């Protein structure tokens, strides 16, 4: 069936790197289609890269364009509940995202990953190990390169990170294997509650052959699994991909096979052991022989902005975990820590309506000074008696620098989004790393 039959006029809502990837894809593969772009921002990012023959409407909506479209492609950041998008849907005009266009185009095997935390590490490591095993993999989606920019005839496996926002507008993505890593409170400003958020994530299994789920978090299990093969991973509960003692050491196990000692991993933290087990389960389900890539697994140190040591001088560790944009990410970082001295924990930013109280019992067990900043930083103040509020990240570091001593750790794991004071979490992490090197 030709999905494009009768589609002559496409409106792309939201520019940026995803919107640009949609425009470039349409111009390359569907040159006869007329493309218009709507972006409600005054200066949409990427507008200077837009071809002069693509009409752009800025600083607001253009309902005339929307209601005359044959297809509307929205940016994942735009909720389907937005009144203008609701009008489009009410008019019977299909609304999709870039991942749905990708799904219409490719017939090469695809694996995909969703979850509240750990998605980027699992996605990146899956690509690294697939390539090391001799399978040409292309990695992207919600991480790095937009999915449509990955399309190439020589790719043998696509590895996509998918957010709940992307899954909302995706309905026909066929997957060799799909992983749902975990579920914790996030984006409560967008969803009606946790079950609403969970249902968006579960869409990843709609057309998957294998569901890779977390035995330690049953909320990741599909509600309807008749069409699926279900494979489990876990570090606490019994699972097909799990941990067990072998020759006196803790080993990663794939089904009943001892794969590698945990001590041989370069990755730090218990949450990363779970991430590795997920990758093994995904690749195995997709027919990739991960055993050919164990050297690459041993040497893999993880992604920037995710529990990354950016400076280690005079015995003081500076750790950039800027990607921790919700409470569960920060809890994961704290659970994997080994600290000899004092922990200086930097938290705050845009809270997205989250409840931060689950941090309190964990903080109570740690030698911590809580350093709060950002628009919702004050919400962390009741969590620990050491809490102090600062007007910026730099003022925190200037203030604590004279008291730092060997064995201490300065950890940026904010449990919040960054866009109150920074362009994005990467910019926040880069500035932290720069300050760490300056003051270390």
From Swiss-Prot:
It holds the Pfam family Mur_ligase_C. It is an enzyme of class 6 (ligase). Its EC number is 6.3.2.9. Pathway: Cell wall biogenesis; peptidoglycan biosynthesis. Disulfide bonds: none annotated. This is UDP-N-acetylmuramoylalanine--D-glutamate ligase. Coiled coil: none annotated. GO terms for cellular component: cytoplasm. Cell wall formation. Catalyzes the addition of glutamate to the nucleotide precursor UDP-N-acetylmuramoyl-L-alanine (UMA). GO terms for molecular function: ATP binding; UDP-N-acetylmuramoylalanine-D-glutamate ligase activity. Belongs to the MurCDEF family. One of its GO terms (biological process) is regulation of cell shape. It catalyses: UDP-N-acetyl-alpha-D-muramoyl-L-alanine + D-glutamate + ATP = UDP-N-acetyl-alpha-D-muramoyl-L-alanyl-D-glutamate + ADP + phosphate + H(+). It comes from the Bacteria. ATP binds at residues 115-121. The keyword Cell wall biogenesis/degradation applies. The keyword Methyltransferase does not apply. It is found in: Cytoplasm. Keywords: ATP-binding, Cell cycle, Cell division, Cell shape, Cell wall biogenesis/degradation, Cytoplasm, Ligase, Nucleotide-binding, Peptidoglycan synthesis. Its main location: cytoplasm.
